[in-house]
Amino acid sequence: VRITTRVLLPFSIIGGLLLVWQGVPQNFSGNVIVDTIEGAKQIVAQGPVAALEIIKHLGTNGGGFIGANSATPIENPTILTNLIELYSMMLLPGACVITFGKMVRDRKCEAQAGSTALTVCSGVDSRSFTARFFGREGRTIFAAMGILFVIGLGICFWAESQGNPALAEAGLSQSMGSMEGKEVRFGVAQSEIGRAHV
């Protein structure tokens, strides 16, 4: 219960408000029929999209309100919402590593100090900021996770920026990279951040 009330709900409220600020719908209205640029009619879904989106991303549950996994402009209208949603998926796993580092560090400190644990552990810590923030073990795990993320992001970005050779042979321009299956609004770079962190 404490995790829900002290971590998930506050992050969900803040993240949901940020998504609403950027244009993600948050209402209880029904679907709206709009006229498109081509003159056709289109049904646009509405509802509590922002609240469900941020909960989906914090819990890495997948799916989505519309079922397109944040690939629609309704669930993900701007680059800022894209970054909010991507980083919210990395928030809790990163916090777990920090928590682990702090828990292990405190136990190690108490084991070394014995009965004088309070005086030794609560004294002024002369270690670096990262060692104090993550703990020694947490810093190592977080660095390993970060290195794997950067390597994966680099490989994905390089591969996708090369374009599709089959489409190049067909005479299609590949100057923007491989845009097949990518969100045109965000391009290759923003799309690859989403792929690399999963």
Explain the meaning of each model-derived region.
Residues 1-195:
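Membrane-proximal intracellular helices of multi-pass ion channels
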